[in-house]
A protein has these predicted regions:
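Structured mid-to-C-terminal alpha-helical surface segments
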Residues: 3-9, 19-224
Length: 224
């Protein structure tokens, strides 16, 4: 979200990658990091400790604690979570980096705004008022308000990520709206939403949640 909004309040140090047609085995991951270090871009990546298996919520993958060091000896310690992209039918945005030093070509793809929105929504629908990803609600508002979303692409993402997932209870926009209404009208949840550390837009909770619901109602005409 920081890359989209350019707002420091949505910045994070943690990194996430999904492999496409590449093994998640530890030795394959170590080889991948080794290849990146051969790019000669002035940054060296060091894996700290053991590679951990991740299995939480609806995510399976591996976690690496890594250290990034540049030519000026600046060091940043962070986490890198690596999963597998299971949704190849979703359109991705290609990111260009000079990786010509590598023997084999690597293409980095970024999730579209529609996929980012849909994955945040899926998590909220699944966990309801138990979800602790409060900033996601304000992310919804930002993406909608700033016209970052294509409605047709968004509906396609809903279909693939939510409607066709047997673990989800929502099969259409009406189901989503009903679920969101229940979440947004929970007094305890709304109180936490309003806290300054969650409300990165500095707007009233009423304005944000009402705006999001209105947008979802506008999608009902486009539902698959």
């Amino acid at each position: 979200m920081h890359n989209i909004s350019k707002d420091v309040r949505r910045a994070t140090r943690d990194l996430d990658l999904d492999f496409i047609k590449y093994s998640l085995a530890d030795d394959a991951i170590i080889n991948f990091i080794s290849k990146l270090n051969k790019v000669n871009d002035g940054i060296i990546i060091t894996i700290i400790g053991n590679i951990e298996k991740l299995h939480h919520q609806d995510y399976d993958g591996k976690r690496l604690n890594i250290s990034l060091k540049d030519n000026y000896n600046n060091i940043i310690d962070t986490k890198l979570d690596i999963g597998v992209n299971k949704f190849l039918e979703l359109e991705q945005e290609e990111m260009c980096f000079d990786l010509s030093m590598l023997d084999n070509e690597i293409t980095l793809l970024a999730n579209s705004c529609e996929q980012i929105f849909s994955e945040k929504l899926k998590s909220l629908l699944k966990f309801g008022i138990r979800s602790t990803r409060y900033k996601d609600i304000f992310d919804f508002y930002y993406l909608i308000k700033n016209k970052k979303l294509d409605k047709e692409k968004l509906i396609k993402c809903f279909d693939i990520l939510i409607y066709k997932d047997d673990t989800m209870n929502e099969n259409n926009i009406e189901d989503i709206i009903k679920r969101l209404d229940g979440i947004f009208n929970n007094v305890g949840y709304r109180k936490i939403l309003g806290q300054a550390n969650n409300n990165w837009l500095g707007l009233s909770v009423d304005e944000v949640t009402d705006f999001v619901i209105i947008y979802f109602k506008s999608l009902s005409k486009l539902s698959v």
